[in-house]
């Protein structure tokens, strides 16, 4: 399940990046009893008023050149659902025009909840 989340975050970072010369940055750190994985892109960014809405089902940022009939606005909602099922948190920090960083925070004592 965590692989699904990471793949989705990386695919979104690649899709919304507008400068191929700037790499997508991925890091993992430990904070107390949590693992924190971050995915940073240098793409279009997300307006402050949309940052909570992007985790809602079917919500898509209206950036016309990124609209695609193969994307339905479910990926981030699915990611957040998976992470919260493991007592974690998925959040974003972003500035429009400067890219986004998604933070996946999960407990280090993660137990499988199959």
Where are these predicted regions, by residue range?
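Acidic ATP/Mg2+-coordinating residue in the GHKL
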Residues: 41
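Short helix-loop "hinge" at the ATP-lid/N-box region of the Bergerat-fold HATPase_c
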Residues: 13-14
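Short beta-strand/loop element within the Bergerat-fold HATPase_c
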Residues: 21-33
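Short conserved segment of the HATPase_c
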Residues: 46-60
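Conserved glycine-rich
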Residues: 87-88
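Glycine-rich GHKL/ HATPase_c ATP-binding element in histidine kinases
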Residues: 98-100
């Amino acid at each position: 399940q965590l692989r699904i989340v990471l793949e989705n975050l990386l695919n979104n970072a690649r899709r919304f990046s507008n400068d191929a010369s700037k790499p997508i940055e991925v890091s993992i750190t430990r904070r107390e009893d949590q693992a924190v994985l971050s995915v940073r892109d240098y793409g279009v960014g997300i307006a402050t008023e949309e940052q909570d809405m992007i985790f809602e089902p079917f919500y898509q940022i209206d950036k016309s050149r990124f609209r695609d009939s193969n994307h339905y606005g479910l990926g981030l909602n699915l990611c957040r659902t998976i992470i919260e099922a493991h007592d974690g948190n998925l959040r974003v920090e972003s500035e429009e025009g400067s890219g986004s960083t998604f933070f996946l925070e999960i407990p280090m004592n993660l137990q499988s909840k199959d």
